[in-house]
């Protein structure tokens, strides 16, 4: 998995979610 550089501890992935990133272990990851 590639880290998208966005945290999702308090809020879900926002900008990175648009490119397909999902929350895993409090960090947004691609795939």
From Swiss-Prot:
Disulfide bonds: 4-21, 8-23, 13-28
Pfam family, one: Cyclotide
Keyword Disulfide bond recorded: yes
Stored PROSITE patterns: CYCLOTIDE, CYCLOTIDE_BRACELET
Protein keywords: Disulfide bond, Knottin, Plant defense
Modification note: This is a cyclic peptide.
SUPFAM superfamilies documented for this protein: Cyclotides
Claim: Acetylation is one of the keywords in the record: no
Any one of the GO BP annotations: defense response
InterPro entries attached to this UniProt entry: Cyclotide, Cyclotide_bracelet_CS, Cyclotide_sf
Crosslink position(s): Cyclopeptide (Ser-Asn): 1-31
Domain of life: Eukaryota
Family of the protein in this entry: Belongs to the cyclotide family. Bracelet subfamily.
Domain notes per entry: The presence of a 'disulfide through disulfide knot' structurally defines this protein as a knottin.
Function field: Probably participates in a plant defense mechanism.
Name of the protein described by the UniProt record: Cyclotide Hyfl-A
């Amino acid at each position: 998995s590639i880290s998208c550089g966005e945290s999702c501890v308090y809020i879900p992935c926002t900008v990175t979610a648009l490119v397909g990133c999902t929350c895993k272990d409090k960090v947004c990851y691609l795939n």
